[in-house]
Design a protein with these regions (language model features):
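Conserved functional loop/turn residues at catalytic and ligand-binding sites
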Residues: 9, 287, 327
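Single conserved hydrophobic/aromatic residue that forms the stacking wall/gate
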Residues: 323-329
Length: 329
């Protein structure tokens, strides 16, 4: 079964526009901002299924990043980053699940940037970066790296391989407000039309990893990445709640308040194996902005995959005004 979504506003405020622009019979009553769209995302966006998989959750393969963007409408990507003594920042899941469509962080960024610059009117993308700090076993050598050094290297490569003028940073959103959180709750996110062709980077880490990053960039001043910060903190702007069924009410409240929220439509193979879209439907109903999946397109022999509504990569969400009416057709 393919799930298609049509968002129908309860109050006629906007037309639903694709990436070519917003249209409708009525004039806009409020400018569209970054948190007024929903986008399809992929989990472990670089992933290639291993030849011999030790577990069901590794049994999926993604198209290359630019193909996901061009053909599947994916606008949110997740990249795991490891430090390697030979190759610097490498991209793979773990040592038992190392297949990847872009072997290094640089290659991943360059692949997405090339597509972005060739399609410079696309809705803004989000790139979630998860640093991995487990020791790597290679050639009988155990390599470790200080977490702060890993974060600095990630920040450095973002600055080197992605143009600053095509990046939406915490400083851009904060503006003249004392904190990022105040800016999000008061002025809101940047306008959608001013954000086309740009990207938001998010550090997918909590605990010590996040705290080390905030030590380097207090209040995220000067930072290139947003963080998953606690509600009420000065850095709070973006949240990841991966269970849209159990966390649906919290997701909906965060969305209503003006935060950007990521969730997941499937995890570990249970949903695709049972052609179960309940989790996906819950994510849509809660108004989550990015909905991540292992199956953004058709897979031979499987009925389950997550379809973008009407082929539009980022449908307008009405959750900032009222919850959408969701029709599954």
């Amino acid at each position: 079964m393919v799930v298609m979504l049509v968002l129908v506003p309860l109050s006629g405020c906007f037309g639903i526009g694709g990436e070519g622009g917003i249209f409708g019979d009525e004039p806009e009553k409020e400018p569209l901002r970054l948190n007024h769209i929903q986008m399809e995302g992929t989990h472990n966006s670089y992933h290639v299924e291993p030849i011999f998989s030790p577990t069901r959750e590794y049994m999926y393969t993604h198209e290359p990043l630019d193909v996901q963007a061009a053909q599947l409408g994916v606008r949110q990507f997740e990249i795991d980053v490891w430090w390697d003594v030979r190759d610097g920042l490498r991209v793979y899941h773990n040592q038992y699940d190392s297949g990847t469509t872009c072997a290094t962080f640089q290659i991943c960024l360059e692949t997405l940037l090339a597509w972005s610059q060739a399609n410079d009117q696309h809705h803004p993308m989000m790139i979630w970066i998860e640093p991995k700090d487990w020791p790597e076993q290679a050639a009988d050598i155990t390599t470790t790296v200080e977490l702060s050094g890993l974060l600095q290297e990630i920040e450095s490569e973002i600055a080197e391989f992605w143009p600053r003028n095509l990046t939406i940073t915490p400083d851009d959103v904060r503006g003249e407000w004392p904190t990022l959180n105040e800016a999000v709750l008061t002025d809101g996110w940047p306008l959608l039309e001013e954000s086309r062709g740009k990207v938001i980077f998010v550090l997918l880490a909590r605990g010590d990893m996040r705290d080390l990053y905030l030590e380097d960039y207090p209040g995220l001043n000067g930072a290139l990445m947003f963080t998953l910060s606690d509600l009420g903190s000065g850095e709070a702007a973006i949240f990841s709640l991966t269970d849209p069924i159990g966390d649906g009410e919290q997701i909906a409240q965060l969305v209503t308040d003006g935060y950007i929220v990521r969730t997941r439509a499937d995890s570990g193979g249970e949903e695709p194996d049972n052609n179960d879209t309940v989790r996906f439907e819950a994510a849509l109903a809660a108004g989550a902005h990015t909905i991540s999946t292992d199956y953004p397109g058709p897979v031979e022999g499987m009925d389950y995959w997550i379809a973008v509504p009407n082929g539009t990569p980022s449908p307008v969400s009405y959750t900032h005004l009222t919850l959408p009416t969701i029709l599954l057709v």
